[in-house]
Amino acid sequence: MNQEIFDKIKNIIVDQLDVDADSVSPESNFISDLDADSLDTVELVMAFEEEFDIDIPDDVAEKITTVGEAVNIIAEKTGAN
């Protein structure tokens, strides 16, 4: 897992969802662990796209359920595998 991407995503999640940084791990599920709702997840994906200057298609975004999945997709899109 790309630590730099994880750290950036973690900061975005902490800011957007107002959660404790210690509660965010690669295994964290956005909805069940971080109490995000569907609007929160859309806003997070938009923030990820802006931060990393990438486009995440809706069909891919809908499949992102954990922080680790988001890191992997962003790493793939940015070529930072």
Curated annotation (Swiss-Prot):
One of its GO terms (molecular function) is acyl carrier activity. InterPro entries: ACP (IPR003231), ACP-like_sf (IPR036736), PP-bd_ACP (IPR009081). Transmembrane segments: none annotated. Pfam families: PP-binding (PF00550). Residues 3-78 form the Carrier domain. One of its GO terms (cellular component) is cytosol. Its main location: cytoplasm. 4'-phosphopantetheine is transferred from CoA to a specific serine of apo-ACP by AcpS. This modification is essential for activity because fatty acids are bound in thioester linkage to the sulfhydryl of the prosthetic group. This is Acyl carrier protein. The gene is acpP.
